[in-house]
């Protein structure tokens, strides 16, 4: 990725949560290079409760004893899931993510290796997420009002534009990674690290975590790029309107899913409920050829215009 630092920023940075903890011990060739030893340690946190888990990770609500801030502490089984180069790339990526500073992005505060685990300290998103909101409306048999769709989508676009302007791809945009605070502020989480420890964004060998947001270029293993994030934004916008993924289907195997994605075969959104502009933006983002998808600047511009228009009507 362009612009990646060759090492992690030092602990004196104002963005870091904790102070330096002393010099690093000599590196063990069997372990991840101990570039993070001057950061926090687990002793600096009072862990309160588990708030999430993934295949290789667990997330806890915790209090940093150094400044009494409530944070999220993500513990990743980094040595069980990847080789040495992937671990080094993962640590570099975290260094890049810490440079992001945006009100709609969950802040990466610190990271350190301890007990053979990668510990990532994050701003706590102590709220619901977009997938829960979609499920709520589906259960109520109600569509999400278009004004509400744009209210949240414009904030998400602002977050993604900030990331792309700094040459950072998200790689895992989906409703479950879009948190919404009690005051209606969007917080985009799980940034950039999906390729390291998320099985849900790759073509899994089973239907567990079926990748409904996987773009055609991922199917053809052509690599992820910034336009792949745009595809995911289009899928998310569609799902907010239709209350299900564009490529969702009952009893569908991975082969038929990939066929639907390659052909952009999805049901049209109801024209009587949603504007032509929304439906047009979805079709532009969910387009087979990534070179013909709009960039995030355009998507954000449309979202801003529609947010203003729907808020005033």
Curated annotation (Swiss-Prot):
Residues annotated as site: Autoinhibitory? 108
Tell me the compartments it is located in.
Answer: Cytoplasm; Nucleus; Nucleus speckle; Cytoplasm, Cytoskeleton, Microtubule organizing center, Centrosome
Q: Which residues cross the membrane?
A: none
Q: Which GO terms describe its biological process?
A: apoptotic process; cell division; chromosome segregation; protein autophosphorylation; protein phosphorylation; regulation of mitotic metaphase/anaphase transition
Q: Where is this region: Interaction with APBB1?
A: 267-270
What is the regulatory mechanism acting on its activity?
Answer: Binding to NEK9 stimulates its activity by releasing the autoinhibitory function of Tyr-108.
EC number, UniProt record: 2.7.11.34
Tissue expression summary: Highly expressed in the liver.
State a GO cellular component annotated for this protein.
protein-containing complex
Entry-linked InterPro entries: Kinase-like_dom_sf, Prot_kinase_dom, Protein_kinase_ATP_BS, Ser-Thr/Tyr_kinase_cat_dom, Ser/Thr_kinase_AS
PTM: Autophosphorylated. Phosphorylation at Ser-206 is required for its activation. Phosphorylated upon IR or UV-induced DNA damage. Phosphorylated by CHEK1 and CHEK2. Interaction with APBB1 down-regulates phosphorylation at Thr-210.
Which Gene Ontology molecular function entries are recorded, alphabetically? Answer: ATP binding; DNA-binding transcription factor binding; kinesin binding; magnesium ion binding; protein kinase binding; protein serine kinase activity; protein serine/threonine kinase activity; transcription corepressor binding
Q: Which residues carry this modification: Phosphoserine?
A: 37, 206
Q: Which cofactor does it need?
A: Mg(2+)
The record's catalysed reaction(s) read: L-seryl-[protein] + ATP = O-phospho-L-seryl-[protein] + ADP + H(+); L-threonyl-[protein] + ATP = O-phospho-L-threonyl-[protein] + ADP + H(+)
Positions of ATP binding: 51-59, 74
For region Disordered, the annotated ranges are: 1-32
Q: What is its main location?
A: cytoplasm
User: What positions does UniProt annotate as the active site of this protein?
Assistant: 172
Q: Which top EC class is named for this enzyme in its record?
A: transferase
Phosphothreonine modified-residue sites: 202, 210
Q: How does it assemble?
A: Interacts with NEK9, predominantly in mitosis. Interacts with KIF11 (via C-terminus). Interacts with APBB1 (via WW domain). Interacts with ANKRA2, ATF4, ARHGAP33, CDC42, CIR1, PRAM1, PTN, PRDX3, PIN1, RAD26L, RBBP6, RPS7, RPS6KB1 and TRIP4. Interacts with STAT3.
| PANTHER family documented for this protein | MITOGEN-ACTIVATED PROTEIN KINASE KINASE KINASE 20-RELATED
> Family per UniProt?
Belongs to the protein kinase superfamily. NEK Ser/Thr protein kinase family. NIMA subfamily.
Q: What does this protein do?
A: Protein kinase which plays an important role in mitotic cell cycle progression. Required for chromosome segregation at metaphase-anaphase transition, robust mitotic spindle formation and cytokinesis. Phosphorylates ATF4, CIR1, PTN, RAD26L, RBBP6, RPS7, TRIP4, RPS6KB1 and histones H1 and H3. Phosphorylates KIF11 to promote mitotic spindle formation. Involved in G2/M phase cell cycle arrest induced by DNA damage. Inhibition of activity results in apoptosis. May contribute to tumorigenesis by suppressing p53/TP53-induced cancer cell senescence. Phosphorylates STAT3.
What is the name of this protein? Serine/threonine-protein kinase Nek6
Organism in which the protein naturally occurs: Mus musculus (Mouse)
């Amino acid at each position: 990725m362009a612009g990646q630092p060759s090492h992690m920023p030092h602990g004196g940075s104002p963005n870091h949560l904790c102070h330096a903890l002393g010099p690093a011990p000599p590196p063990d060739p069997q372990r991840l290079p101990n570039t993070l030893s001057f950061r926090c340690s687990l002793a600096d946190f009072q862990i309160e409760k588990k708030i999430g888990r993934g295949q290789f990770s667990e997330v806890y609500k915790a209090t940093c004893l150094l400044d009494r801030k409530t944070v999220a502490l993500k513990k990743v089984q980094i040595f069980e899931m990847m080789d040495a180069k992937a671990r080094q790339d993962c640590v570099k990526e975290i260094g890049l993510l810490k440079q992001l500073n945006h009100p709609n992005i969950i802040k990466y505060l610190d990271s350190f290796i301890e007990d053979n685990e990668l510990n990532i300290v994050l701003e706590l998103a102590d709220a619901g997420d977009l997938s829960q909101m979609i499920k709520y409306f589906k259960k109520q048999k109600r569509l999400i009002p278009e004004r509400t769709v744009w209210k949240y989508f414009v904030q998400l676009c602002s977050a993604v534009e900030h990331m792309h302007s700094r040459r950072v791809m998200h790689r895992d945009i989906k409703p479950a990674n879009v948190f919404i605070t009690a005051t209606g502020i969007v917080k985009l989480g799980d940034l950039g690290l999906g390729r390291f420890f998320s099985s849900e964004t790759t073509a899994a060998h089973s239907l567990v975590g079926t990748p409904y947001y996987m773009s055609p270029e991922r199917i053809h293993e052509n690599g992820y790029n910034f336009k792949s994030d745009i595809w995911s934004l289009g899928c998310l916008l569609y799902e907010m309107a239709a209350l299900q993924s564009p490529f969702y289907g009952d009893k569908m195997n991975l082969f038929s899913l990939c066929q639907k994605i390659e052909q952009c075969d999805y049901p049209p959104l109801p024209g009587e409920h949603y504007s032509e502009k929304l439906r047009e933006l979805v079709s532009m983002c969910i387009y087979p050829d990534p070179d013909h998808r709009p960039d995030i600047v355009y998507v954000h511009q449309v979202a801003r215009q529609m947010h203003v228009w729907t808020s005033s009507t």
